[in-house]
Amino acid sequence: MGKSKSATKVVAEIKATKPLKKGKREPEDDIDTKVSLKKQKKDVIAAVQKEKAVKKVPKKVESSDDSDSESEEEEKAKKVPAKKAASSSDESSDDSSSDDEPAPKKAVAATNGTVAKKSKDDSSSSDDDSSDEEVAVTKKPAAAAKNGSVKAKKESSSEDDSSSEDEPAKKPAAKIAKPAAKDSSSSDDDSDEDSEDEKPATKKAAPAAAKAASSSDSSDEDSDEESEDEKPAQKKADTKASKKSSSDESSESEEDESEDEEETPKKKSSDVEMVDAEKSSAKQPKTPSTPAAGGSKTLFAANLSFNIERADVENFFKEAGEVVDVRFSTNRDDGSFRGFGHVEFASSEEAQKALEFHGRPLLGREIRLDIAQERGERGERPAFTPQSGNFRSGGDGGDEKKIFVKGFDASLSEDDIKNTLREHFSSCGEIKNVSVPIDRDTGNSKGIAYLEFSEGKEKALELNGSDMGGGFYLVVDEPRPRGDSSGGGGFGRGNGRFGSGGGRGRDGGRGRFGSGGGRGRDGGRGRFGSGGGRGSDRGRGRPSFTPQGKKTTFGDE
């Protein structure tokens, strides 16, 4: 009963010290008041502490009763620095409480709890010790469920102690929990000699509990920080996942685009193939694989005006078809036009249609047309455009119905030559056309002619070497390019400017553009001849642009 009376006295004295809460803003006055109250009420505190220690820590009481005087001496030696620590902790707690007053509502509850706790430290530090132990024990479950820990503390301790210690445990920060641990150490120092036996055990338990509490708080804070860190980490993970998904989508879209791109080149290649097919189909009618008879695309055109131009020819044949090329024969001496040439069309059908224009007037002259041998025919020989005395109507003359004739009397007029040739070859078959090239400079025949038969060409070729009378022997052959013609043969006059045989004249067999050797004075040395020598055939071939051999001048020139 005595203990209960002392307990009631403690409650009355605590009420007397409550007004000290208002003057708590002056830390120095509070410290002096605390010291005086502690000295006067050592007995009461000792009784209360023993009662609570017996109830709550029986094992520790037994160990403290058995402790010797050495622990008491050690405890006395530790009292002075502990008091200093308590005063400093009180000052710091006061400052923190005064600083925390304008804080948010969450911090207000914590500051109120610390004020109540400090007032209780002034009145009964032993009560704080026991309550500190409870706080230290209950801090770990408080991190999981704070409201449950508050109720447990109220049941285990007195109302005053629970109000002072449970409120800081309700929503504590790490800074509030640490001063509570320091207050518990200061309350241990204020106890009397009777309670000193218990303190070695309780002090060891209290700092450990405080450390555990601080560690639990720090672990809670760490866990909170980790949870907060985990949130941005989750956000980052979410963003990464979204980025990954977006990257996957982008990769899929890129793959789709790549597939589309792969499909488009295929389409392009097919388009190219279609275009090529269209081109080839467009070209097929222009180049038939089986050309018609006389399927050359080139026409020989003679009796042309000397003032003619390419545009005149294109306009003349525009009704027949497309004119691809026009080649006029020119004189190699001065480059003057010789009055004939070749016209190439886009197709053989167009050339055949243009052949119907034979005899029509072109710039005041009736044009004479004939089919010329196409390029590449007869052993890949090109179409022949005559440039000299070896001129043959129709160019290469590869048509099956044409023959080449020379060796006749070239001094005759064009009409006389035609009539003579018609009479000579009349027995072979029907003659469709006779062409006698004329030198426009002199107006004389070039000594050659072309005959076209409807039929009977083979019989006409049999007349090669036949005598036309007057000592003229004909040379009859297939139409050939100039390079394949040979000089010599016969006893023609041979002294003409364009003599083509091997006669005995001054320039026999050579002439200005002669192609064969002979006995002439300058045999084989014509102005554009490429060979020489008595009786030599080295002069064959088309005349070269660069004169070769010895240049001779004559007095009559």
Swiss-Prot record:
Residues 174-184, 203-217 have a biased composition (Low complexity). Disruption phenotype: Reduced growth, bushy plants with stunted leaves, abnormal vascular patterns and many stems. Plants exhibit a pointed narrow shape of leaves, but no filamentous leaves. Plants with double mutations in this protein and in AS2 or AS1 protein show severe defects in leaf shape and filamentous leaves are efficiently formed, although a few normally shaped leaves and markedly narrow leaves are also generated. Altered nucleolus ultrastructure. Residues 49-63, 230-247, 264-281 have a biased composition (Basic and acidic residues). GO terms for molecular function: DNA binding; mRNA binding. Residues 297-374, 401-481 form the RRM domain. Residues 1-297, 376-398, 474-557 are annotated as: Disordered. SMART domains: RRM (SM00360). InterPro entries: NUCL_RRM1 (IPR034349), NUCL_RRM2 (IPR034350), Nucleotide-bd_a/b_plait_sf (IPR012677), RBD_domain_sf (IPR035979), RRM_dom (IPR000504). Induction: By glucose and sucrose (at protein level). The keyword Signal does not apply. It comes from the Eukaryota. Expressed in roots, leaves, shoots and flowers. Keywords: DNA-binding, Nucleus, Repeat, Repressor, RNA-binding, rRNA processing, Stress response. It is found in: Nucleus, Nucleolus. Residues 485-503 have a biased composition (Gly residues). Pfam families: RRM_1. GO terms for cellular component: mitochondrion; nucleolus; nucleus. Interacts with THAL in the nucleus. This is Nucleolin 1. It comes from Arabidopsis thaliana. The gene is NUCL1.
